[in-house]
């Protein structure tokens, strides 16, 4: 923990337990103690001599920020536990893997890149729309896509009151009955691509996230998890902070 004072929710996030937003919720739910006293506001500054507990358990010591790239297979969810007992990507982690959270999410049927980190502040940085990171997806649909279809998808439609901004969409390949598309979005709203294509009666057969900002799926095998080298992670975080307005 750093010597200078910082907001308590930020310190909780840095410990890898959850995001800053979730830390603030825990505080408002009166599940957080500071120096053995329950608190109810996140507007508190703490330093490295303070003791922070969640549900009466002391938070872990802040570790060096790390992140991993995971190729999520279809059929897995991205939360750590599930009332329906569906498989989660956390079951893919080795037993001695550090405590991590996901950056963003993918629905159960979507494959591809999901980023894991032990730092909730990094997760916040990469998730926020203000950061402006592009997400690129490879999508197979049950249709021979026409130029008119592309025009409609690029129109950034409003579906059920939610506006979806499509940065780009291009045809990779197609047959008489199927098309592979590459779609780029920025905000990563819940089920964004599925909602956009469904709005235009285009059925998805496969949806694969290829990249998230500067981080690429590349040749990572399904179910495989690879740590981002420290020097690369440090450089990318520095560049992202330089060109974003997030504080």
Question: Each PLM stretch: what is its role?
Answer:
Residues 1-247:
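Basic, flexible Lys/Arg- and Gly-enriched helix-loop patches that mediate nucleic-acid binding at interfaces
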């Amino acid at each position: 923990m750093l010597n200078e004072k910082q907001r308590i929710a930020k310190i909780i996030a840095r410990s890898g337990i959850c995001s800053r937003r979730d830390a603030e919720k825990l505080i408002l739910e009166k599940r957080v103690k500071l120096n053995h006293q329950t608190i109810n506001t996140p507007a508190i500054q703490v330093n490295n001599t303070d003791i922070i507990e969640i549900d009466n358990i002391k938070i872990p010591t802040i570790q060096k920020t790390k992140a991993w790239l995971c190729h999520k297979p279809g059929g897995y969810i991205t939360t750590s536990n599930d009332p329906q007992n569906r498989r989660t990507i956390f079951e893919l982690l080795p037993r001695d893997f550090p405590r991590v959270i996901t950056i963003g999410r993918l629905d159960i049927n979507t494959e591809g890149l999901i980023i894991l980190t032990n730092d909730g502040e990094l997760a916040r940085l990469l998730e926020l729309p203000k950061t402006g990171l592009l997400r690129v997806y490879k999508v197979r649909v049950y249709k021979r896509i026409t130029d008119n279809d592309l025009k409609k998808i690029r129109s950034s439609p409003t579906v059920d009151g939610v506006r979806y901004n499509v940065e780009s969409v291009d045809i990779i390949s197609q047959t008489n009955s199927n098309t592979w598309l590459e779609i780029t979005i920025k905000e990563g709203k819940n089920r964004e691509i599925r909602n956009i294509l469904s709005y235009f009666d285009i059925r998805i057969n496969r949806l694969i996230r290829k990249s998230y900002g500067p981080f690429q799926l590349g040749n990572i095998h399904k179910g495989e998890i690879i740590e981002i080298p420290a020097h690369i992670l440090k450089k990318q975080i520095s560049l992202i902070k330089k060109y974003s307005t997030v504080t």
